[in-house]
Amino acid sequence: MYYVEKRIEVAMAHRLCLTYESKSSHLHGHNAIVTVYCKSETLNENGMVVDFSTVKDIVKGLLDHQYVNDKVDFNPTAENLARWICEQVPNCYKVTFQESRDNIATYEKE
């Protein structure tokens, strides 16, 4: 099995829809670090699991300089964003979404 990971920094904004009062319910932004983990039993015709630039382009296109609430139909928590990103990237099995130094969410396919 081959494994690769790609780390991408994105500047994004969102607001959370919560059942309790929180600063996160208001529009705010993050300089998030997204780490995408991909795997494959075989390499493609170029000798890769996936091209790192493809992963970067996908993640940047989804999130960078975006108001994420306009792009998704779910509550854009770090956990949900990690799952959403994982679903978009070829051969992805795990995503870590770090919205700040201390707040990190991970989604991993079973």
Where are the regions that the model predicts?
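Charge-rich, low-complexity N-terminal segments
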Residues: 1-110
